[in-house]
Amino acid sequence: MRLFLCEKPSQAKDIAKVLGANRKGDGCWQGTDVCVTWCIGHLLETAPPDSYDERYKRWNLADLPIIPEKWKMLVKPKTASQFKAVKRLLGEARELVIATDADREGEMIARELVEHCRYRGPVQRLWLSALDDASIRKALARLLPGHETFNLYHSALGRSRADWLIGMNMSRLFTLLGRQSGYQGVLPVGRVQTPTLRLVVDRDRSIADFVPVPFWTIDVQLEHAGFGFNAQWRAPEDACDDQGRCLNQALAQQAAADIGNAGTARAVKVTTERVREAAPLPFDLGTLQELCSKKFGLGAQETLDIAQALYETHKLITYPRSDCGYLPQSQHAEAPAILAALQRADASLAPLQPYLEPQRRSRAWNDAKVSAHHGIIPTAAASDPSRLPAKHKAVYTLIRARYLAQFLPNHEYDRTQADFDCAGHALRAVGKQIVEPGWRRALPEALTPAKGREAPPAQVLPALREGQDCTVQGLQLKDLWTQPPKPFTEGDLIKAMKNVAKLVDDPRLKQKLKETTGIGTEATRASIIQGLLDRGYLVKNGKALSATPAAFSLIDAVPRAIADPGTTAIWEQALDMVQSGEMTLEEFVARQSAWMGKLVERCSGMRMTISGPAAGAAPPWKKKRRGGGKGKAAAGKPRQPRKKATT
């Protein structure tokens, strides 16, 4: 029997249909000499400390660090029946095809079962990027040898064990240190969650410490040949800060008076350049979460859940947990069929049809930049998006629009910059004249990538020549204040986690971080943020995230290395080295274990002052063990709701 092992029931059903395995069995779909079974996420979990020694049931500083000599895995009680079915089928199989998600975690979900159940037969890998019938058939025709993806398993296993070492040891350590100060709650510490929390704490402190500074601007309304437009006063450099803002009120007031009295402004320099903008890349998960947060107010986890449903349930998009926006060259051959399906499914795309060029290859098609997964794009299994729930439709429309944009011309416009002299003061006007809408026909203005504060004003300038005079129609002298940094939204935090290199000063570390995925992965960032919200470290007010008092206290107490975004990003790079074979799993775990021992020794004598939940929660060792989801090392949660208090 040939056994296909999938990650979830819905995935198994889709693959079984293509294989003709239509008979429902015990935890599987059966066909002629083929069987398709499934996991329900991880069927196994890393054993808790008390599985290694009974004394670890009680939390004690003297027992730290806890470092297993031989790691144990336990069957999750909630899914034990499915584990039994998978174990039985592995015992009967003559050949195994791993068909879990095509990523590190999917590899681990399957391989840990193969190892635990001692399957020794041949292994192949089904590498799927979409779950529509055509994509499944294509992947079945190109099965990979099992050894090609084995290191993904060791990379995921290394991540899991590092999470366990830090979560179990540091959470116990800081919870016990907190108890010495009278704090009765649990203080969970994580390899990824703590640096993420520090990002928010640092941002909140920047906001709290911000001192506003006044500055002045002058907007001038000019007119030429009956055509009105706006220009801005350009203050002398010695009167401005590094952002070009005038800090001299008297100078601004004098300039406003002079400009108002002058009556005319003379054009001294006029330049026009043709600007060509390529279409934005298809989405990776992070950029999709960022834009959905900004545009729709969706949380990171909510966006991921919607994308997962569009992938698994509706079969409308490719694999969503991708960290790459590029597409393989081979995928371009499928473009005509996908474009035709999209247009058949939605009549509202008809006005776009004359402009689409299926043969066009945008910069998105680049084999050199494609990682394990390509950008998130629609599949040929398109259907009318109006039948989707409102939020699902909104997310799908974004993904579809980014794909359609790849087959439209560049967006082109003429950017004109006109400099004026007005009573000895410099003015500047910037105009934009669209020449070719191009890919913006597919993307509403609000959904295109933001260009920041330097975007040209949305105005068209009249035909101007140097030496021409324009009439001053009016002006506004504005008294403004510098603004503090904005609180993080979930989308902003996802972006900061990805681009953590920008927050690191060390040039060598910064360069290394630019080559990594930042804090966490595309698949885990949403759950990290949600976990911080669930544990009461973060609160959400509208779209804005802010840290609680307990978060400030914890970040101040933990060793800098644990809370430093640069450190955790380097760990992710080490996991990439395990994946590529440059470092062994054993070497990675040994380094983590040695580092953990040093941290425990250094921190055991600390004294803490904690703000957070009220006293009175049950001791952590009396709580029932709580199982974590993908990528989590559960360290326990207080049963009582968190309350604001200071101990």
What kind of feature is each model-predicted range?
Residues 71, 78, 84, 91-92, ...:
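C-terminal or mid-to-C-terminal helical accessory/interaction module adjacent to the motor/catalytic core
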Residues 240-281, 566:
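Metal- or metallocofactor-binding catalytic centers and their adjacent structured scaffolds
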Residues 2-3, 79, 116, 171, ...:
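Basic, low-complexity terminal or inter-domain segments flanking catalytic cores
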Residues 210-235, 262-306, 489, 511-512:
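C-terminal accessory/connector segments of nucleic-acid motor ATPases
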Residues 1-168:
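Intrinsically disordered, low-complexity regulatory segments
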Residues 314-317, 536:
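Glycine-centered, phosphate/nucleic-acid-interacting loop/turn motifs that mediate DNA/RNA or nucleotide
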Residues 1-3, 101-102, 183-186, 272-281, ...:
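Conserved short loop/turn motifs at secondary-structure junctions
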